[in-house]
């Protein structure tokens, strides 16, 4: 962990090491060739400048692939500030390259929780020409932390007592202290932010779940676009991305032979499907746990054994959580696992595993092996290895998803930002999805790169199906 991040005099950036910029730029150049969707959007919209002068905050993993997204947003006119959405996911050379290009970025690998939330605040803080502090007009969010901070800050300024309520979560305690500090240092700040804020596009399942929860209570402050449920995001990033990056994270962290191991994948949504198939492809024997009978049946029909976590204790070598839920692996599970077990998470937040309870366990001994790999010697003498402190193993212990699949996701994010701005006076304060026509267009932008040739419908065929020759080709309710 870099405990002394480098800061520019004008708060232009706060990163690990600006000297890494040249390395970062070389990798960004490589990634651009693997991200045809984003590069096509640049070519299409650079002259039109649909986001000209629009203040955009990003709270999303500061990786090489994200750097290509940031520069795409800038190329189409946006005024961008950025922070990572995970304390371990930043690639420091990517952050350095972006800082050198003039984009304010506040991110480094190995932030503390206090540093993480302060970086989020920095990314949300724009200064107007008259010196007034304000916020973004649009947000690119991943997990909903930037959205959460604004909502909680605004609610505090309007009488909420949430910051004074007790909390068992260490991260919640950090957020509450930050909001109390801002209330003193910047009175009325969040109200000014909300007055200018026009929309948010959300990247991941967990963040989308948060948005729907807020919207259901009538507290959503702006229109939101659910990018996660675009087919070209969830069925590609979540599935095919995890299929490659989970094993990458496990192997970089532990140099473990997966073949012959018994692995438990908790959850069989798109992320769980990709994870289970990844482990099986390496020769692991895979057990799936599920709460949903449909997903459980899917797993069984794919040949996976489906049972409970409790039934696997003392047998499994590897546990992977993928659910987006909390307390999936609890302290009573971990103390009953076999010796030398590996536990990790590829869902967005660290609360899938009871990490705080593990750290607080009486008699436990914690030994850091290397960054993002911790060895716990339990009171019963068994050893448990926890990866990335229960946060995203593919980004904490490796470099996340490959560029090509992230081009799908980030093309959706860019189109969502354009759509939110163009329709800022049309959309109500609700959660929307991008139209299927755009979803198909994102897919189309990636076909040439991998040598795909589409069949074209004849007019008679299109009429028979009741669709246009150009699409959309499937109804909204179609399940891919």
Curated annotation (Swiss-Prot):
Main location per the UniProt record: cytoplasm
Q: Where does this one sit in the cell? A: Cytoplasm
Q: What does it catalyze?
A: S-adenosyl-L-homocysteine + H2O = L-homocysteine + adenosine
Q: Which cofactors, by name?
A: NAD(+)
Q: What does the entry list as the binding residues for NAD(+)? A: 204-206, 238, 267-272, 290, 325, 346-348, 394
Give EC number(s), comma-separated.
3.13.2.1
Transmembrane stretches in the record are: none
Instruction: Report the cofactor remark.
Output: Binds 1 NAD(+) per subunit.
Q: Which cysteines are joined by disulfide bonds?
A: none
Give the metabolic or biological pathway. Answer: Amino-acid biosynthesis; L-homocysteine biosynthesis; L-homocysteine from S-adenosyl-L-homocysteine: step 1/1
* One of the Pfam families matching this protein, by short name: AdoHcyase
Name one molecular function that GO assigns to this entry. adenosylhomocysteinase activity
Residues binding substrate? 63, 142, 203, 233, 237
| Top-rank taxon | Bacteria
Q: Which UniProt keywords apply?
A: Cytoplasm, Hydrolase, NAD, One-carbon metabolism
Family label: Belongs to the adenosylhomocysteinase family.
Query: What is the protein name given in its UniProt record?
Result: Adenosylhomocysteinase
Q: Give the organism, scientific name.
A: Xylella fastidiosa (strain Temecula1 / ATCC 700964)
């Amino acid at each position: 962990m870099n405990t002394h991040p480098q800061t520019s005099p004008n708060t232009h950036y706060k990163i690990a090491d600006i000297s890494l910029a040249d390395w970062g730029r070389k990798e960004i150049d490589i990634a651009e060739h693997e991200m045809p969707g984003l590069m096509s959007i640049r070519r299409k919209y650079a002259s039109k400048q649909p986001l000209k002068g629009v203040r955009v905050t990003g709270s999303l993993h500061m990786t090489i692939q994200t750097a290509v997204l940031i520069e795409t947003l800038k190329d189409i006119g946006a005024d961008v500030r950025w922070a990572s959405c995970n304390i371990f996911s930043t690639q420091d050379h990517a952050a350095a390259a972006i800082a050198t290009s003039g984009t304010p970025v506040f991110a480094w690998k190995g932030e503390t929780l206090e540093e993480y939330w302060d970086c989020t605040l920095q990314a949300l803080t724009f200064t107007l020409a008259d010196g007034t502090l304000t916020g973004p007009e649009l947000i690119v969010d991943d997990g909903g932390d930037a959205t959460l901070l604004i909502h909680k800050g605004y609610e505090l300024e309007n009488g909420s007592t949430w910051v004074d309520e007790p909390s068992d979560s260490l991260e919640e305690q950090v957020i509450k202290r930050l909001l109390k500090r801002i209330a003193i240092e910047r009175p009325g700040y969040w109200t000014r932010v909300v007055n200018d804020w026009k929309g948010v596009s959300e990247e991941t399942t967990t963040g989308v779940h948060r948005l729907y929860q807020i919207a259901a209570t009538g507290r959503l402050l702006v229109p939101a676009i659910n990018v996660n449920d675009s087919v070209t995001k969830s069925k590609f990033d979540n599935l095919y991305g995890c299929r490659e990056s989970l094993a990458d994270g496990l192997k970089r962290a532990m140099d473990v032979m997966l073949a012959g191991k018994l692995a438990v994948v908790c959850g069989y949504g798109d992320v769980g499907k990709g994870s289970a198939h990844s482990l099986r492809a390496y020769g692991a024997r895979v057990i799936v746990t599920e709460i949903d009978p449909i997903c459980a049946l899917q797993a069984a029909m794919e040949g996976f054994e489906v049972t409970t976590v409790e039934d696997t204790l003392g047998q499994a070598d590897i546990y992977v959580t993928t659910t987006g839920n909390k307390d999936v692996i609890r302290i009573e599970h971990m103390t009953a696992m076999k010796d030398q077990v590996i536990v990790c998470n590829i869902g967005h937040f660290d609360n899938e595993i009871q990490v705080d309870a593990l750290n607080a366990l009486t008699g436990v001994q914690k030994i850091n092996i290397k960054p993002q790999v911790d060895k716990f010697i339990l009171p019963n003498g068994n050893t448990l290895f926890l990866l990335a402190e229960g946060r995203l193993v593919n980004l904490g212990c490796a470099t996340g998803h490959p560029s090509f699949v992230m081009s799908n996701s980030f093309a959706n994010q860019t189109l969502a930002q354009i759509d939110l701005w163009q329709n800022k006076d049309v959309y109500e304060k609700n959660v929307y999805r991008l139209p299927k026509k755009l979803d198909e267009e994102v897919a189309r932008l990636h076909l040439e790169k991998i040598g795909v040739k589409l069949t074209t419908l004849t007019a008679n065929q299109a009429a028979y199906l009741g669709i246009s020759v150009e699409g959309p080709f499937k109804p909204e309710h179609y399940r891919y």
